[in-house]
């Protein structure tokens, strides 16, 4: 099985909250697709609660588009990580990390403005696979956590696992 890019960085040195360019690629038509690691929690030390991350998934996708789309950028998808420490965001374009961090903080402010559970988009049996597994309160706790701590930048060079370590881990 090939080693995925996300597993070539040292999660023990990863800071959170922080933005990291996880991958950049070009399509056959010349568009640049950038994948960002939006790390909400320090790996192996913190984790987002399942109801909170699910609600955040519904809110974050729209709010990030409100703040980041335009000027050569269009979000394709924002999806939670299985480890529940962050989200991956794929987009067309190459915004710098600070632009992404600013949009992320603004989106978290928007999450705090949601007044009631019934304002969560697509919260129904037809549009959500587990529509009863939501918590606006938990999503807002996550948003407050991001706003209070601020958003930094994780560098791939600083986090890269040495080839020797990768070989040792995959014997």
Curated annotation (Swiss-Prot):
It is an enzyme of class 4 (lyase). Its EC number is 4.4.1.21. Involved in the synthesis of autoinducer 2 (AI-2) which is secreted by bacteria and is used to communicate both the cell density and the metabolic potential of the environment. The regulation of gene expression in response to changes in cell density is called quorum sensing. Catalyzes the transformation of S-ribosylhomocysteine (RHC) to homocysteine (HC) and 4,5-dihydroxy-2,3-pentadione (DPD). InterPro entries: LuxS_sf (IPR037005), Metalloenz_LuxS/M16 (IPR011249), S-ribosylhomocysteinase (IPR003815). This is S-ribosylhomocysteine lyase. Keywords: Autoinducer synthesis, Iron, Lyase, Metal-binding, Quorum sensing. It catalyses: S-(5-deoxy-D-ribos-5-yl)-L-homocysteine = (S)-4,5-dihydroxypentane-2,3-dione + L-homocysteine. Fe cation binds at residues 54, 58, 128. HAMAP family: LuxS. GO terms for biological process: quorum sensing. It comes from Cronobacter sakazakii (strain ATCC BAA-894). Pfam families: LuxS. It comes from the Bacteria. Homodimer. The lineage of its organism: Bacteria, Pseudomonadati, Pseudomonadota, Gammaproteobacteria, Enterobacterales. Its cofactor is Fe cation. Belongs to the LuxS family. Binds 1 Fe cation per subunit. GO terms for molecular function: iron ion binding; S-ribosylhomocysteine lyase activity.
């Amino acid at each position: 099985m090939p080693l995925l890019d996300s597993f070539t960085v040292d999660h023990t040195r990863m800071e959170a909250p922080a933005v990291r360019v996880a991958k950049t690629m070009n399509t056959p038509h010349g568009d640049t697709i950038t994948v960002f690691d939006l790390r909400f929690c320090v790996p192996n030390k913190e984790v987002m609660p399942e109801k909170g991350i699910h609600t955040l998934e519904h809110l974050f996708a729209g709010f990030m588009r409100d703040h980041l789309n335009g000027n050569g950028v269009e979000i394709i998808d924002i999806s939670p990580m299985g480890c529940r420490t962050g989200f991956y965001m794929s987009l067309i374009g190459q915004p710098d990390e600070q632009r992404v961090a600013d949009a992320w903080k603004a989106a978290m402010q928007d999450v705090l403005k949601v007044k009631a559970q019934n304002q969560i988009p697509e919260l129904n049996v037809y549009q959500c696979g587990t529509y009863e597994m939501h918590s606006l309160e938990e999503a807002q706790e996550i948003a407050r956590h991001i706003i209070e701590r601020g958003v930094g930048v994780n560098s791939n060079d600083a986090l890269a696992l040495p080839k020797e370590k990768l070989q040792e881990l995959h014997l």
